[in-house]
Amino acid sequence: MILNTLNSLKIVFAGTDKFSKDHLKILVTNTTHKILGVITKPDQPLGRGKQITSSLTKKLAKKLKIPVFQPTALNTSTFYNQIYNLNADIIIVVSYGKIIPQLILNIFPLGGINVHTSLLPRWRGPSPIQSALLNGDKLTGITIIKMNNNIDTGDIIYSSSCIINKSDTSVTLQNKLKILSCQGLIQVLKNFKSSYFPIRQSNLATYSNKINKEDAKLIWLKSAIQLERSIRAYNPWPICYFKINNQLSIKVWSANVIIHFNQHKYQIGEIILINKHGMQIKTSKNILNITTVQLPGKKIMHANNLCNSKNKWCIPGTKLTNT
């Protein structure tokens, strides 16, 4: 394979979601690099109607007339030959969702680079943004690494940090990190062969886990601070919720913590007050003031409106269970 000797690189891009799509768009519109192909996940059934839907990255690639590859397995000879025949210099991976085998990475003279939304080695794994919010981190950032055959362990090429605000959700924090990572990716690709000096990651790694819908269930035995962090971390997905009588599921979109010094007279899970400020619930430590909620099939509304929706349970003194 002949390496492209110009500043303009021949790239294979791998990604799936909106975060990935925005990076692909930046590479196409703000650089002279040529995208020879896009690897993305197979179309999947989404929504209540289970309609087969293409990834946002695929939709953009199709619009830009870039060849799209959607392998169900990445270790087949067919997929290998498809990528090999593109004769690309490098593969760039941004929120693809699958592990790229070393066999595929070896195709590219410049190897592969990955954009990760944390300051590695902190929060390796699939949910670094949510993990930073759940942990109450005050600082996070993005890291661009040289890919190897392990997950998020490659040498660091570039990193940039940003402050986490107390009001940040996963979506607002991701938007801030997207700006940093797009800028960083463009910078890294300039004179790629001679412009960076990789740094080996330290051994002080922490790990994030795959998120499931059940993770977003509000457990009143936790502290108000823990619950408020969860509400921000799981926005916009899977959205925190609690259940009434183990049936009615109420989504919680926003909340804040009230420091309360006379908590002993309330039970954990008890609704203390519902007013224009929200619905206040006793937790294991302090009060969680829920401000915006969503009933099944309804629009997001202020928690005070629950009193106007004929919900007999929605009165002070009601004890919400953890089941």
UniProtKB/Swiss-Prot annotation:
Extent of the signal sequence: none
Catalytic activity as recorded in UniProt: L-methionyl-tRNA(fMet) + (6R)-10-formyltetrahydrofolate = N-formyl-L-methionyl-tRNA(fMet) + (6S)-5,6,7,8-tetrahydrofolate + H(+)
Enzyme class: transferase
Keywords annotated in UniProt: Protein biosynthesis, Transferase
Recorded GO CC terms: cytosol
Regions annotated as coiled coil: none
Residues bound to (6S)-5,6,7,8-tetrahydrofolate: 118-121
Pfam families: Formyl_trans_C, Formyl_trans_N
EC number(s) given by UniProt: 2.1.2.9
Matching SUPFAM superfamilies: FMT C-terminal domain-like (SSF50486), Formyltransferase (SSF53328)
Any GO MF annotation of the entry: methionyl-tRNA formyltransferase activity
Family, similarity comment: Belongs to the Fmt family.
Physiological role: Attaches a formyl group to the free amino group of methionyl-tRNA(fMet). The formyl group appears to play a dual role in the initiator identity of N-formylmethionyl-tRNA by promoting its recognition by IF2 and preventing the misappropriation of this tRNA by the elongation apparatus.
Protein name stated in the entry: Methionyl-tRNA formyltransferase
The organism of origin for this protein: Buchnera aphidicola subsp. Baizongia pistaciae (strain Bp)
